[in-house]
């Protein structure tokens, strides 16, 4: 059984790594648009070799003969990938869209893939892809979700069907992200301001007392690292969240602010390691690199 992963970044590689360790592992191929960039192609090729994955140099080569397709690209590229795949009229049975995009975007993608004869499965990844890899909890939705959930379950993936309507899984993910990505932005704003004011210890102690069970210094340092590492991708996801809220008639005031802050941190080029750096250390690395926070 052949599986192709389109988009071989952090998520695509993690899924490939996990699946490759399964007894009933599919034969995995991948394609990433970065393969077409001479400055990045070697990185993609090496990552594929390390995982025993066949690296394809064109999308057409990647989808040819694949029974199942998984899309793990950026939110801004998800619809373009669906259009490109559907234009190839692939023989694949199903297309699992694991990208964080608005329900309306997924419904548009579904129309394209279904018209090309490929079942579309709205798939939402509900936790960080590490450390659980392919076993990270996922929600599935769509008229064929039950059928293809069995395929993923056979590979020991942790999936749950939440309905037959495309967009239902995405809605859950998008609205959860209002809180998750918004909390990242809030803690960044709080943590950096508190450190600038010289009162971070007092602020963190107060938060720890109000919300026992959460180490706010550790959480804030972790969130800062996530934003500087993945802020551009997170900003794209939050733009899809904004679309989702607007589709529901909810004014996305806070989420629009989250977009701006995530993108600013993602573009900062600051490199943090939350396992090694405290909140204070992370904050001062940011102060040294960024003019606007």
Give names to the regions the model predicted.
Residues 59-120:
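Rossmann-fold NAD(P) dinucleotide-binding segment
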Residues 172-277:
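Helical "substrate-binding/catalytic lid" subdomain
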Residues 101, 106-181:
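Rossmann-fold dinucleotide-binding core
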């Amino acid at each position: 059984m052949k599986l192709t992963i389109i988009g071989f970044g952090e998520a695509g590689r993690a899924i490939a790594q996990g699946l490759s360790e399964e007894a009933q592992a599919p034969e995995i191929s991948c394609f990433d648009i970065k393969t077409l960039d001479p400055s990045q192609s070697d990185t993609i090729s090496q990552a594929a070799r390390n995982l025993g994955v066949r690296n394809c140099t064109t999308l057409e080569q990647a989808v040819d003969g694949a029974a199942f397709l998984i899309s793990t690209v950026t939110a801004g590229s998800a619809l373009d990938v669906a259009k490109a795949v559907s234009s190839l009229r692939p023989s694949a049975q199903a297309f699992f869209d694991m990208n964080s995009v608005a329900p309306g975007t997924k419904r548009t993608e579904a129309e394209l893939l279904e018209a090309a004869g490929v079942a579309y499965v709205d798939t939402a990844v509900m936790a960080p892809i590490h450390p659980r890899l392919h076993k990270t909890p996922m929600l599935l939705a769509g008229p064929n979700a039950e059928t293809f959930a069995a395929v993923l379950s056979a590979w020991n993936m942790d999936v749950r069907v939440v309905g037959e309507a495309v967009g239902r899984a995405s809605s859950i993910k998008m609205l959860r992200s209002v809180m998750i990505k918004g909390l990242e932005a809030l803690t960044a704003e709080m943590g950096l301001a508190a450190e600038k004011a010289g009162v971070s210890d007092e602020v963190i102690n107060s938060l720890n007392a109000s919300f026992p069970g959460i180490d706010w210094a550790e959480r804030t340092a972790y969130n800062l690292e996530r934003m500087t590492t993945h802020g551009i991708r997170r900003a794209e996801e939050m733009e899809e969240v904004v679309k989702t809220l607007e589709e529901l008639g909810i004014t996305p005031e806070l989420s629009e602010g989250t977009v701006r802050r995530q993108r600013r941190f993602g573009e900062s080029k600051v490199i943090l390691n939350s396992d090694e750096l405290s909140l204070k250390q992370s904050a001062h690395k940011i102060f040294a690199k960024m003019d606007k926070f």
